[in-house]
Amino acid sequence: MAVPQNRVTRSRRNMRRSHDALVASNPAECPNCGELKRPHHVCGACGHYDSREVVAVTAETDLDEDAA
């Protein structure tokens, strides 16, 4: 089994972990519909990316109404 050769001090451990923090993404406004979207991603509301429709978004239907 692998065992650490030497003890890692709190200082060295914390210095190594100093780069592990998560950074919140900066949402941008969709130029087509105005909703907030992640940069370099398809808009979830309208399906546009780079002023083109990439994904056809359909209206959500209620499953209870379809079953009845």
UniProtKB/Swiss-Prot annotation:
InterPro entries xrefs: Ribosomal_bL32 (IPR002677), Ribosomal_bL32_bact (IPR044957), Ribosomal_zn-bd (IPR011332)
Pfam families in alphabetical order: Ribosomal_L32p
Coiled coil: none
Biological process according to GO: translation
Ranges for region Disordered: 1-20
Source species, domain of life: Bacteria
GO cellular component: a single term: large ribosomal subunit
GO molecular function: structural constituent of ribosome
Keywords for this protein: Ribonucleoprotein, Ribosomal protein
Disulfide bond residue pairs: none
Similarity comment: Belongs to the bacterial ribosomal protein bL32 family.
HAMAP family given in the database record: Ribosomal_bL32
Protein name: Large ribosomal subunit protein bL32
Organism from which the protein derives: Cereibacter sphaeroides (strain ATCC 17023 / DSM 158 / JCM 6121 / CCUG 31486 / LMG 2827 / NBRC 12203 / NCIMB 8253 / ATH 2.4.1.) (Rhodobacter sphaeroides)
Gene: rpmF
